[in-house]
Amino acid sequence: MSLLFLRRAKPLFVSCCSATHSRSSFLSPTLTNQLVRSFHGSRTMSESEKKILTEEELERKKKKEEKAKEKELKKQKALEKERLAELKAKQAKDGTNVPKKSAKKSSKRDASEENPEDFVDPETPLGERKRLSSQMAKQYSPATVEKSWYAWWEKSDLFKADAKSSKPPFVIVLPPPNVTGALHIGHALTSAIEDTIIRWKRMSGYNALWVPGVDHAGIATQVVVEKKIMRDRGMTRHDVGREEFVKEVWKWKNQYGGTILTQLRRLGASLDWSRECFTMDEQRSKAVTEAFVRLYKEGLIYRDIRLVNWDCILRTAISDVEVEYIDIKEKTLLKVPGYEKPVEFGLLTSFAYPLEGGLGEVIVATTRVETMLGDTAIAIHPDDARYKHLHGKFAVHPFNGRKLPIICDGILVDPNFGTGCVKITPAHDPNDCEVGKRHKLEFINIFTDDGKINTNGGSDFAGMPRFAAREAVVEALQKQGLYRGAKNNEMRLGLCSRTNDVIEPMIKPQWYVNCSMIGKEALDVAITDENKKLEFVPKQYTAEWRRWLENIRDWCISRQLWWGHRIPAWYATLEEDQLKEVGAYSDHWVVARTEDDAREEAAQKFLGKKFELTRDPDVLDTWFSSGLFPLSVLGWPDVTDDFKAFYPTSVLETGHDILFFWVARMVMMGMKLGGEVPFSKVYFHPMIRDAHGRKMSKSLGNVIDPLEVINGVTLEGLHKRLEEGNLDPKEVIVAKEGQVKDFPNGIPECGTDALRFALVSYTAQSDKINLDILRVVGYRQWCNKLWNAVRFAMMKLGDGYTPPQTLSPETMPFSCQWILSVLNKAISKTVVSLDAFEFSDAANTIYAWWQYQFCDVYIEAIKPYFAGDNPTFASERAHAQHALWISLETGLRLLHPFMPFVTEELWQRLPAPKDTERKASIMICDYPSAIENWSNEKVESEMDTVLATVKCMRALRAGLLEKQKNERLPAFALCENNVTSEIVKSHELEIRTLANLSSLEVVSKGQHAAPPGSSVETVNENLKVYLEVDGAINTEAEQEKIRNKIGELQKQKEKLQKMMSVSTYEEKVPANIKEDNANKLAKILQEFDFFEKESARLAAETSNSGNQ
C-alpha cells in the first residue's frame, strides 16, 4: 500500500518501520529487492568532477537527467491518479460518498497537495545550504541525499580547526594516499574510520583537526608513469631523459592528484582542506632538506659502500622491509619479470675449482652458480684436517685464470656441511661480503644495473641476462669437465614487494641513517612503563613493534630514481684529483640546504683549491619524507602557530602492514626532530580482502573502487576500468573472468553512508576484512528504513509541532519511558566503545537501537495513539510526539559520525525547539551524552517481558497460520503470580499492538481453562500464552511439541535428582544451594504437571472432535 502524506487531509494509512523485518533477513539481503534508480538517484556533479568530463559527456548527462525527471513526474502523476481512484473506491464502500461538487473540489485540492514537484529537491547553488523539497521523497535515494551537503560544509569552514582556539586539540594526519591513480577500498576504510573519529571528537568539544595530504610515492609513481610511456610511446625513461620524464610525472600528479581529493570528498571526509599538502610541495621539500642536513650534521646520516637489495627492473636499491621472502622446498619454476621462460630455483649446483700447480681440485656448491664469475676466494675451516695441506694455496678460475686464495674462516664455514669448501663472492652475497671485509678480498661486481653480466664476468657471458647466464655457466662448466651435478635444496628467495623481481645483492655506495640510538628510543616509549608514551590498538602489535626495533638495521635512504626529493649532497671534484669519477673519494661530499651553501662550505673545506660541484643524482626513499609527515604538515621546521597548537598529534590510524615502513620511522624522526612522540595512540585497522578472503589484486579483477560501490556500476563498466588501466592484455583477460564470477550483475548503487557504515562495522574482524558487497547493500536498505522512520515522524508531529525545552520521562507512557531508557544505554555504550577504539561495537550498538528498538518496537507501539482523534489518547499522543522527536534528534546525532550525509539531511528536516538558536549543521552539535533521569531499569525489565511475550505470540502465529494471513486473533496470558499478571495487564495495549491481537485476556493460575482450538507457548517460568486459532490447530503437531518439552523437562529432572541423591549431599552442600535446587526441582515438576494437562486437553479435544 502506498504511503500517503497530505498537508491538511488525514492520512488513510501509514506503514513504516515494520516489525516484520527479522534480524536475519535484514543482515542477509539479496540483490532482487534493490530499488530502481530514478530521478532521485541522479545528482549534480562537483566542479572537480566536471573538469574530468568532456563537453559531449556533460551534454549527454544533462539530457539523461532531464529524461529521468520527466519519467519521475509521469510516475508521480500516475501514482496520484491511482491513489484518488482508491480513495473514491473506499468512500463508496464505506458509504462516505460526498456530493459530486464537494468531491470534485476535494480531489482537485488533494491532487495539488500531492504535486510531484514537491518531492524533488530544488537545485542548490554550489556551496550553499542544501535546498530541500517541501515533501520528503517516497524512497531514500543516496545520490539525492548526498548531493550539495559536502560543498556547503566545506565552504562554511565547518572542517577548519583554529590554532588560536581554547578548546583542547585533537589531531589526526591522513596517511597520504599515493598519487598513483584513484583511491581503492582500503583508502575508503581509512577515511571511514578517521572521519568517524574526527566528527565524534569535533561534536565532543574538541578543536578537531584532520590534515589531508597526498604522497609523491617515488617508486610506485615512477613505475606507473614508465608503463604509461612505454604503452603510449614505446619508450623507456632512459629514452626520454630525466628532465622530460620528471615533467611527465608532474603531469600525472596534476591529473590524478585531483581525482584522489575529489574521491575523498565523495567519501564525506571532513578534512581541513585549508591545510592540504603534497609531500613534494615547497614546505614539505624544505622540511625534507632540513631534516637531512640536521641528521647529517649530527652524524646520524652517513654514506657508505655496502651490499644493498637491488631491483634490476627498477634499477634501484630498496630497503630491507621492501623485500618479501618466499620459501622454496625443491626444484621450482618461477615467472621472473623480463624473462619469457620460467626460471629454476631450489637447486644446489656443485662444481670443481682446479687447484694451482696441479694439486687436484676442490668442490663447492651454490644455488646461484652464475655468481662464480665474481668469486675471489675459497673458504675452508681452519681446523678441517682434510684441507690442512691447502692452507695458503690457490685455486684457479676456469674461465679467466684468476687466482683464488684458499682462506681459513671459522665464522662462515661449517666443516660438516657439504664438502666443507665455500666459494666466496664478496660483491653479491651478504655473508661473503663480511668474509671479504675480514680477509681484505677483492670485490668484483659482475652485474649491470639492469641485471646483465658486465665485462667483469668475461667476454663469453657479457651482456647476458643473469638467469640466462646461469644456464650458460653450467654448460661451460660441463664442457671443461668441472660440473658435478645438482640436487634439490631448500632456500628462501627474496622478491621486491613492488615488482616481484628477484632481489640481487649488489655492492653500491648509498646514504644511510644510523638507527641504533633513535630506534632504541622509539622502542622504549612503547614498552617501558616509566617512559610509556605510545599505545597500540590492538595491543598485539606491541610485540611486533618490539621485534622490529630490537633487530633494527641502519636504513638505506637513497634511491636510484628520478622522481622524488633529490638528496641535498654535492660532490666536490678537485682539480688535483687523480680520479675524476663522482664519488671516488668519500671525504669530498658536502651536505647543505642549497647549492650556494654547499659551494661556501666546500670552499672552506678545500681552502685555496679549485673544485667543481656535482649534485648527487639519487633521490630519497619515499618513507623519509613520509616519516616527517606529522611534523611537516604543521609547518616544521618553522615554529608556526599550527606547530605550537597541534604538535604532537593525537592519534595515528593506519594499516598494520606499514608498521615499520611508516609508523616506526615517524616515531624515530618525530622524537629526534620534533622533541616528542608524534602521536600517543596508534590504531591499526584490518586489511581488506575480497569476499573469498583473497588479497585484492588488479590482475585478479577483485579490486573494489569505492566510487563504484557508491554510484553503482555495471559489469561492462567494471570491464572498461580494466581496459583503461595499466594491466598487461593477458592480465586483463584473467581479471575480467574474476569480475564475471564475483560481480555477475555489476555492483548496485549503495551510497557513501552505507559503504562507510559497512566498513566500520567490519573492523572487529581480526586483522583481515572479507568484504562482501551484499553487506553494503544491506546497510543501504537500512538507510531507507531510517528515511521512512523520519517520514512517519514528520507526519505524526505535524506542521505546528514545537519540541519541548525539557522532558519528564516519568510522566510519559510506558513505551516512551522505555525508548528513552534504552537510548540512554545505547549512548553510554557507544561512547565507551568509541573511547576504546572499538568502532564495530559502537556501530552495532547504534544500529541495534535504531533497527530493533526504535523502528521495530517503539514506532509500532505508539501507532494506536495516532489512530484518529481518539480523545482517550490525547495525553499519550502528546507525550509520544515529544519522545518521538527527542529519540530521532538524539539518535541522528549519535549516528552522524558514521553516516554524515543521511543524518544531516534528516536532522535538517526535524522541527527546531522554540526560542532556541539551532546550530547550522548536525556536525557541530554536541555528541549525545547519557542523561541520568532517562534510565529506568524497571521499565526495561517489564518491556523485556512484553517483547518476550510478543515473540512467543508471533511464533505461535507463524506456526499455525499461513504467512499471508494477518488477521487479529484472540490470546490468553496465563500468569503464575500477581507480579507477572500486573505487568501483562499494565502493558496489554503494547502486547496487543505488537503481536497483532484482537484481544488479550489475562488470567491467573487455576482460574481459566484453555479454550478449544488454542496453542500454547512458554514465555518464562511465570508466564504462558495461548493463541486461539479456530479450526487451524494441528493437534498432532501440538502433541509432538508438548512431548518434546516433556522430554527436555525429564532430562533436567533426572540430572538434578541425581545430583541431590549423592550420599554426601545433605552434609556438604551449603544450605542456600540446597534451597535453590529444591526450588528448581519444584518448578520442573510444576512444568511437568502443566504440560501433561495440556496433552490431556488436546487429546480430549481430538476425541470430542472425532465423536462429532
Curated annotation (Swiss-Prot):
Function noted in UniProt: Required for embryo development and seed viability.
Organism encoding this protein: Arabidopsis thaliana (Mouse-ear cress)
EC number(s) stated in the UniProt entry for this protein: 6.1.1.9
Residue numbers spanned by region Disordered: 57-138
Main location: mitochondrion
Similarity remark: Belongs to the class-I aminoacyl-tRNA synthetase family.
Motif ('HIGH' region): 177-187
Top class in the EC scheme: ligase
Domain of life: Eukaryota
Residue interval(s) of motif 'KMSKS' region: 695-699
InterPro entries for this protein: aa-tRNA-synth_I_CS (IPR001412), aa-tRNA-synth_Ia (IPR002300), Anticodon_Ia_Val (IPR033705), M/V/L/I-tRNA-synth_anticd-bd (IPR013155), Rossmann-like_a/b/a_fold (IPR014729), tRNAsynth_Ia_anticodon-bd (IPR009080), Val-tRNA_synth_C_sf (IPR037118), Val/Leu/Ile-tRNA-synth_edit (IPR009008)
Coiled coil: 1032-1064
Keyword match Isomerase: no
GO cellular component: chloroplast; cytosol; extracellular region; mitochondrion
Taxonomic lineage of the native organism: Eukaryota, Viridiplantae, Streptophyta, Embryophyta, Tracheophyta
GO molecular function: aminoacyl-tRNA deacylase activity; ATP binding; valine-tRNA ligase activity
Protein name stated in the entry: Valine--tRNA ligase, mitochondrial 1
Gene: TWN2
